[in-house]
Regions:
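Chalcogenol-based redox active-site neighborhoods
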Residues: 1-162
């Protein structure tokens, strides 16, 4: 298996739910800016909303750093909308919620659990050239922290133009 770190983000085209509307998101939308792909197992679960709301509460900080967040699960964009409509906490999310019901994007980035039809908790920070600069993969019972992700993005952005260790 080829290492994914420093590789080019694969091509993709998926449906998404954002701010009350459906839209298509492709890898081309990520070019020219920093992006985070934030994979989680499923909508309507217990740990996932805590992570997604944590990201939503720090969304302005990420945006101030020139970063767009894209959450991704194997749920459809219709399920994302239903969860958004049903949950007061999920309504705080302003970033695109990407739908990968076939698991194609999850498989391309190595986070798909075949037996369960869902993703691991995977985080990918992508630079403006489309290269994956940070990879984090957790078992699904281990949540993530948006403050730590802010630190990692800051470090990745600082690395540009600097000598490597």
């Amino acid at each position: 298996m080829e290492p994914i770190l420093n590789s080019q983000l694969p091509e993709f085209s998926v449906q998404a739910f954002q701010n009350g509307a459906f839209k298509t998101v492709t890898n081309n939308e990520l070019k020219g800016k920093w992006a985070i792909l934030f994979f989680y197992p499923a909508d309507f679960t217990f740990v996932c909303p805590t992570e997604l709301v944590d990201m939503a509460e720090k969304y302005d900080q990420f945006k101030a750093m020139g970063v767009e967040i894209y959450s991704v699960s194997t749920d459809s964009h219709f399920v994302h909308k239903a969860w958004h409509d049903a949950s007061e906490s999920i309504r705080k999310i302003q970033y695109p919620m990407l739908a990968d019901p076939t698991g194609a994007l999850c498989r391309a980035l190595g986070v798909y659990i075949e037996e369960e039809g869902m993703a691991y908790r995977g985080t990918f920070v992508v630079n403006p050239e489309g290269k994956i600069k940070v990879v984090e993969l957790n078992d699904n019972n281990i949540g993530r922290d948006a403050s730590e992700l802010l630190r990692k993005v800051e470090a990745a952005q600082f690395e540009i133009g600097r000598a490597h260790v």
